[in-house]
């Protein structure tokens, strides 16, 4: 009896195989191609699920949802051109740069200060300036401050994800200078130091204040400068530019937060 049952099952299996082959053979080439192009609905759903899971796994190596990305420094660069009867300036600034610089204002000491600003802030900076140096360096220094402030404002954008605030104390031999900044979209300069000499080379020391006032006004930022110590004017001015560079670099860097650092929701 067992042998007969086995034989019956074998015959039944062979019959199914033959029926399948016959069904397949009875289909036209067009029908077979159509089946290959349009698999069953269940197969489609499985494929979509796999693709979605693969994309999710590529974006996040863990199962936890990925945190929203900060926007800090995603487009942190700007190029400004400004021409007046007193100066002609083209300035390029990249805040998330590498400390590269190419500066030519026609005022050697001022170039030196701006190069230090770029290097210590790790900014890329290019300035081509032609000013009325036959008068003095006042217009050149102030107007470069105006254009630099405009470039900073453009480069920081909506300030999402940025630290916004920073304070840096810069030593340089006898000089010690504190600079605090706030990228708040409000202009304010606090710089109450009076230099003991009128010039360093061709550079007029009183223009330091005019430069930072222009930057603050055009960038929409608070700048506080405190000369804590120092006797050498060159060192004091250089420490001021470097302190400003370091403070600004911290203020524009990524805080890890989402959005702007303000209860108002915008700056």
Regions found by a protein language model. Name each.
Residues 3, 56, 71-267:
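N-terminal intrinsically disordered, cationic/polar leader segments
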